[in-house]
């Protein structure tokens, strides 16, 4: 795929094009590279490759393409993943010289695959009495035992007083076996979050029915710097 892209750029550049490249990300399952062809003119191209699948990444593999952040920064543009953000082409076939930090894109990151791209932390109730040090843009997954058939669900309490906090949604997993013998559907709710700016954060999650007093609550502390 890289060779095909390089050959296409060489033809687009014209003349006796000279090819060069810059690797912007090299992870076990993700490889991104910028190719440059200098001939009668200079043209650029980018590739994002799924190393484990041996194919080019589709936008929706790592991103929510229906998000406002995707539409604002990435839609219709050529881009590659880098360590601190996404490098975007300023013009068709032009240099990928615009850096969009991940802190501006956290709501566009597909949290199910986010660990391939960003540092991610998995926390459970044992983390309540601790303060976790993070960097802006890193992901947090809070694992909470839940049984939605009881009518209760875990939700994050309003964090509008902490403008750097980003609520990235939730998911629920149901184990194949039920070792506890509980009635209903005991499983784990996963609450996803990130932080876009430095600061000290206190995040509260409550387990409750709608419009009812919480049955349980947990507080997690984070120092982002």
Give the location of each predicted region:
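Compositionally biased intrinsically disordered regions enriched in Thr/Gly
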Residues: 1-139, 149-150, 172-195, 206, ...
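Short Gly/aromatic-enriched secondary-structure transition segments
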Residues: 152-162
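Short aromatic-acidic-glycine turn motif
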Residues: 162-170
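Short tyrosine-centred short linear motifs in exposed loops/low-complexity segments
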Residues: 197-201
């Amino acid at each position: 795929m890289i060779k095909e892209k390089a050959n296409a750029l060489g033809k687009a550049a014209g003349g006796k094009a000279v090819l060069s490249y810059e690797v912007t990300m090299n992870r076990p399952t993700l490889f991104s590279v910028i190719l440059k062809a200098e001939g009668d003119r200079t043209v650029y191209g980018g590739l994002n490759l799924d190393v484990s699948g041996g194919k080019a990444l589709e936008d929706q593999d790592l991103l929510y393409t229906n998000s406002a952040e995707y539409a604002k920064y990435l839609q219709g543009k050529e881009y590659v993943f880098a360590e601190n953000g996404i490098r975007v082409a300023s013009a068709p076939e032009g240099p990928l010289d615009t850096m969009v930090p991940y802190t501006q894109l956290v709501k566009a990151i597909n949290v199910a695959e986010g660990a391939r791209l960003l540092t991610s932390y998995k926390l459970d109730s044992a983390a309540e009495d601790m303060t976790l040090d993070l960097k802006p843009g890193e992901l947090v997954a809070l694992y909470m035992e839940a049984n939605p058939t009881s009518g209760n669900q875990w939700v994050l309490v309003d964090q509008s007083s902490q403008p750097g906090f980003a609520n990235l949604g939730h998911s629920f997993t149901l184990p194949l076996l039920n070792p506890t013998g509980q009635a209903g559907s005991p499983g784990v709710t996963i609450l996803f979050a990130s932080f876009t700016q430095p600061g000290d954060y206190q995040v509260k999650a409550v387990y409750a029915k709608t419009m009812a007093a919480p049955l349980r609550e947990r507080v997690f502390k984070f120092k982002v710097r």
